[in-house]
Amino acid sequence: MSGDTEEVTRLRKPRFSYEENQILIREVRAHYPMLYGAQSRRLSVAERRRVWEGIAAKINAITNWKRTAQEVQKRWNDFKRRTKEKLARVPHSTQSGTAEEAMTAEEETIFAILGPGVMPGSSHYGPVTHLGAMDFNPSGPGSSSPETSLSAPCAPIEAPLLLHPKESPSPTSQLHIVQLPHLTPSPDPSECPSPPPPGSGTPLLTPSGVAQHYDPTVAMLRAQQETAEAIRHLTYTLRQSMDRLTNVLAAILPLVPHQPPESPTPSGILGPVYYPTKTEPESEPCCPVTYEEENGEDGGEEEIQEVIAEPPRSPSPPPPNKRKRFGYLSQRKRRGRWKNL
């Protein structure tokens, strides 16, 4: 069983040595813009893999074990993870922590490469001078130029993270500079006023001057005055225009001849107009057929002469939904009642 354990142990590669870690940190710092910076978006995955392969080749040049690009990248990710975890546990100043929580030189270098964005709660601290950021960088002849160039843009935010408990003379001096204009008399107009310190706002403005420039009541009163003046001017213009129009009408009316109103003549009066209306024919009280009996001279033959009166006009058809009913005197359709006579 022990032989199997030794066999497994032999197959595992040794840990990264100090020299390998230094080469890894130095090469990642040199190629950081291409791997994680602004240029990484323009590079493809294959191009970034070739960068990691170049870093692995430089590490393999000093060791007998061959590191792959994936192993080198994993080692760098472990560095970042451990540095972030220690920053979360350690106080904002490395000098106030214990020996176990103090950051090593490698971790400080990695923190300088990554910037203050990896620090939890870094957005709660305000900007400070560049001197505190320079104190954080590890002193060394070989790490001056690249590290300074990378940490310089992030200097205003790095300082409060690590140098907060130390004495800070610069904010006190700024406070005195801010209070001096209030205590000293007004300067000579011929002299050029010194620019206010950064972050102090506008200390030269007195409270009365600020109230005079930003008082909403004064601005409202001015707006009301301007509106009243505009209304007064418009009223005067309208009155003047109405007076001129009245004078013009008074001058024109005498020149127009007077014409009496035309009265309508009797011949022009139209009589009432009657429109014909449709009426139904009156029903005849008697039967439309009359019979006359004449006695002839030929021996008493009776000749019946049928006289048919002119049939009246048929009335207008009733509405479709109304049933027509016949009365006692209303006309009915003959159904051949007198055909045999």
Curated annotation (Swiss-Prot):
- Residue stretches of biased makeup (Pro residues): 184-200
Residue ranges crossing the lipid bilayer per the database entry: none
Which molecular function term from Gene Ontology is one that the record holds? DNA-binding transcription factor activity, RNA polymerase II-specific
Q: Does the keyword Nucleus apply?
A: yes
Q: List compositional bias (Basic residues) regions by residue number.
A: 321-341
User: Where do the coiled-coil regions begin and end?
Assistant: none
Q: Where does the protein end up?
A: Nucleus
Alphabetic keyword roster? DNA-binding, Nucleus, Repressor, Transcription, Transcription regulation
This protein's record includes keyword Protein transport: no
Q: Where is this region: Disordered?
A: 84-103, 180-210, 309-341
What does the UniProt function comment say about this protein?
Transcriptional repressor; DNA-binding protein that specifically recognizes the core sequence 5'-YAAC[GT]G-3'.
PANTHER family xref list? MYB-RELATED TRANSCRIPTION FACTOR, PARTNER OF PROFILIN
What's the protein called, per UniProt?
Myb-related transcription factor, partner of profilin
Q: Which organism is it from?
A: Xenopus laevis (African clawed frog)
- Lineage start: Eukaryota, Metazoa, Chordata, Craniata, Vertebrata
